[in-house]
Amino acid sequence: MALRLVIAEKPSVAQTIAAALGVKGKQDGYIEGGGYLISWCVGHLVQLAEAAAYGEQYRKWQLDSLPILPEEWQYAVDPDKGKQFATLKELMHRTDVSEVVNACDAGREGELIFRFVYEVAGCKKPMRRLWISSMEDGAIKAGFASLKDGREYDALFASALCRAKADWLIGINATRLFSCLYGKTLNVGRVQTPTLKMLTDRDAAISHFQKEKYYHVRLDLSGAEAASERISDKAEADALKGACEAGKAVCVSFTREKKTAAPPKLFDLTSLQREANRIFGYTAKQTLDLAQALYEKQLLTYPRTDSSFLTDDMGDTAAGIITLLCEKLPFMAGVGFTPGIAKVLDSKKVSDHHAIIPTMELAKTELAALPESERNILTLAGARLLSATAEPHIFEAVTAVFSCAGTDFTARGKTVLSDGWKEIERRYRATLKSKPDPEDGENEGVTLPELSEGQSFEKPAAKVTEHTTTPPKPHSEASLLSAMERAGNGDTDPDAERRGLGTPATRAAVIEKLVKGGFAERKGKQLIPTQNGAALISILPDMLTSPQLTAEWESNLTQIAKGAADPGEFLSGIEAMARELVQTHAAALDGKKDLFREEKPSIGKCPRCGSPVHEGKKNYYCSNRECAFVMWKNDRFFEERKTAFSAKIAAALLKSGKANVKKLYSPKTGKTYDGTIVLADTGGKYVNYRIEVQKN
């Protein structure tokens, strides 16, 4: 009997697929039954090999070995995952296996994970592709009923392979180049470095910001407060105030304009991460991990998507989920809700996967039984589906302009005509433990009294209010994700192909690398570049730090995935950049050679030259290279007395020439005693010590 080998990205997904297909025979590293062998990768089982695989000369980080440009790329199995790779290879080569199904995540990285294993295992059997956006049993069965020819995804694999090779070429060469030049490991990445540049640019804008005072003159006109434009001079504002109080204000225009605020779009991954950061303070990685966990529990659709629409054939599915949400979510109790589902359906705006929404599995789940963080994300996605299909928010914007003392004053108001989707948002926000800061414009406007053109106010009450210009805010993960998403778009048509730094699936990992590498740090919800982060950006060329250039690469990778761009041409450009980097950066920048030199704490001053003394692994040494003063930790004097030469003892010797030490061992008597060690430096190659016995 011919068997079908199914390979998932991780064990939990393999188990879900097996359950949906009724496969129950657990074996070592796979599940068997019903004509299926279902196994799994454990993330990236196979990766591009390290530089040393291309020759011993690349084992050490040396400038003269750069650039490293492989002619034939090598691959390496993760040594910690070798057993599972061996299992997959054996299963692929079983004579009773007729075809292999790629059931890894339906996206660029999932394609790469499977293809690397398939290629390195030397498998030649036909490939099929499972491409689904939900882990519900019905979706899995439907996916297996309509498997695609794996070769239809060759362009997607080409894009993934180009991405991996580009990251390798830039990462290996730039990291080694600048690390050797500046004497410190400096991790440079194709996406992470321009992302760091965004943080340092914002930090610089804050540091260089000059606060300025400005003033408004405000008139009280029978319940309407009208304000002047900004006035930079206090005396000018005071003079205007006096003139107004002695004069007359006349309404020169009064307009009402009906406006509509459309409902928000459904979540793609980046917008979900932004909102979860703003509301709950979750990092981008935390949100992705939570969404992935919910996906694997069949409660949420595939999270790594860049689409905010559903396909045209999902109307009935969406309607069923909305009905379920109205029953399950407490804040919808008693709300009569008729969704406008058509506004979230648009197959033309769905690429690989549709927007993130809950699934019908919610019917079988008690929300209260979920971990709080997972419940928060699931409820957030549910609330967004309801808001996105609700009526628009309709309001009337009222503007009144008054003339007084030759100056215009403006009063603005807002009257809500229909809450629409904002009523759902308000109900949802009311359930949150901590209330997020309102978004720009959420609280704007007040109700103005009825006014008419020509209406006048004699000697109106006036006041001067003082204000200060505010600097830009540090990036939060929410704002940084937005900046990464918009990078390279410029003033292009909003419906044009988006570029951006990274992809929805990779942005969280980029941020984590910056934090773990010590180039950025979290302070509450803020992301701040560290001193090393700012220093790194200061030494790197624009070709490595430009968000626009990296966004163009990401756009090229998207075109390669569509079969519309040449992979070879793309990689040739990356290789040329690696060559140019090495050729144009043969030495450290003037004055910046010691930029990353860490100041070691001093334990005291050198008794010979007065320079700071530092602790090394084996000694305490003078920082002045011209001075020979050094105290060795394994000095025979201390070893004979069975006493560790600690930094505390060394500091005391440097400070006063003496250190009181308890329980010194006497080689003569075999007993211990308390004594004072005296530094007896003769200025020679070695430092001597002697004992002063403490008398009781």
PLM feature spans:
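Intrinsically disordered, low-complexity regulatory segments
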Residues: 1-164, 168, 471
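C-terminal or mid-to-C-terminal helical accessory/interaction module adjacent to the motor/catalytic core
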Residues: 137-221, 256-260
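Conserved ATP-binding/catalytic motifs of P-loop helicase motor domains
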Residues: 126, 196, 300
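Amphipathic alpha-helical transducer elements in NTP-driven molecular machines
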Residues: 11-18, 35-38, 42, 78-89, ...
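Basic, low-complexity terminal or inter-domain segments flanking catalytic cores
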Residues: 2-5, 81, 92, 120, ...
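Conserved short loop/turn motifs at secondary-structure junctions
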Residues: 2-5, 103-106, 183-185, 256-265, ...
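Metal- or metallocofactor-binding catalytic centers and their adjacent structured scaffolds
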Residues: 235-267, 273
